[in-house]
Amino acid sequence: MGSGNWIIDNLNSALEMWNGRLEEIWQLITTSPENFKGGGIWNVIVGINGGLKAVGYALLVLFFVMGIVKTCGSFAEMKKPELAFKCFIRFVLAQAAVTWGMELMTGAFRVAQSMVTTIIDSSGLTAMSATALPDEMASIIEDVGFIDSIPLWAVTLLGSLFIWVLSLVMILTVYSRFFKLYIATASAPVPLASFAGQPSSSIGVAFLKSYAAICLEGCVIVLACVIFSAFASSPPAIADDTLAAATIVWNYVGELIFNMLVLVGAIKMSDRIIRELMGLG
């Protein structure tokens, strides 16, 4: 229900949009790919992964032959038992990776999700702290006359626009993590087949590093949300209530947007942060 003041209602609408996106992120980050959007997308991804296994098996032979040709200088070296055994073990392990790749990847994601759950439980948060307009700020805005309220319209419009844009950027980044998970899972048999040959194994290593980074992005996102929740629990204070109303509101909106920018920046760079911290670049 509106307050009857357009400026207050505009700010509250923007903050409700922000709080709604935070709640959505909190739910998404604890959701597994199998349950995302009812699991329909996951069923399609599983089917694609199964279809690409045939391609993976064909590439197994190709990468295996390429590896033997590049690592063996002559036909005589291929007859060495230790070399033949090493190549055989590599081929068997690569075949197992292609065959059981889905199970391995879902297992890795569950490990990352358990880390996310541990972070949430350790923080003591069950939900994100809502950001609300302080009562004293609402009182200052309500006491402003019509002429003096004109600058406030511009300030609140600009601030609300920033909050809406930041909300959309933040939620799109979290959604993109799911799409990266789906793309990596669907195409997994192809890069995993590269482990059959030693020269091509770098492709598989790079793929596993990228997948690990995608899974661990959730930890960075949760940590960023926990830190922001601490900021939101103590909203920006009104330093000097003798200033003009437009200046007070501008200072409040500016500090609020800065805190939001910190959260959005951390979420947006979660992939880069985890790669730098874990050496997965």
Predicted features, each with a name:
Residues 45-53, 85-89, 93, 142-145, ...:
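Alpha-helical membrane-interface segments at transmembrane helix boundaries
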Residues 48-55, 91, 95, 172, ...:
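Loop-to-transmembrane-helix entry motif
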